[in-house]
From Swiss-Prot:
Pfam families: Ribosomal_L20 (PF00453). Keywords: Ribonucleoprotein, Ribosomal protein, RNA-binding, rRNA-binding. CDD domains: Ribosomal_L20. The gene is rplT. Binds directly to 23S ribosomal RNA and is necessary for the in vitro assembly process of the 50S ribosomal subunit. It is not involved in the protein synthesizing functions of that subunit. Belongs to the bacterial ribosomal protein bL20 family. This is Large ribosomal subunit protein bL20. One of its GO terms (cellular component) is ribonucleoprotein complex. The keyword Ribosomal protein applies.
Length: 127
């Protein structure tokens, strides 16, 4: 049976793993087995957190919008309801950006949402 010489492939495989783990602390950046294990965990964290990032940004946009509309004397919930009734279709990302970068435009949007709201808070809403 012929001899299989795999030293080059094995060294390359180990070198790639250790290069990818170069920023890790302690043995995780120096020992192949520890580095490989940490890389597998890192890939899982990366996948999970790419999904979580979307929710984190949505929470951030809602907080920014809430702070801006409370300065105008309305709650976030009533503001979103007013936007829907006024037929204004801006997503939370755009609203948060407008609230931060252009307060005058945001104030006009808030005024339009306020105008679309019914006077009585408990009145049935027809959308």
């Amino acid at each position: 049976m012929a001899r299989v010489k795999r030293a080059v492939n094995a060294h390359k495989k180990r070198r790639v793993v250790l290069e990818r783990a170069s920023g890790y602390r302690g043995q995780r950046s120096r020992l192949y087995r520890k580095a490989k294990e940490q890389l597998l965990h890192s890939f899982n964290y990366n996948f999970r957190d790419r999904k979580a990032r979307k929710g984190d940004f949505r929470k951030l946009w809602i907080q920014r919008i809430n702070a801006a509309v409370r300065a105008e004397g309305i709650t976030y919930n009533r503001f979103i309801q007013g936007l829907r009734l006024a037929g204004i279709e801006l997503d939370r990302r755009a609203l948060a950006e407008i609230a931060v970068s252009d307060p005058n435009t945001f104030k006009t949007i808030v005024d339009a949402a306020k105008a679309a709201l019914p006077e009585d808070v408990n009145a049935p809403v027809e959308a």
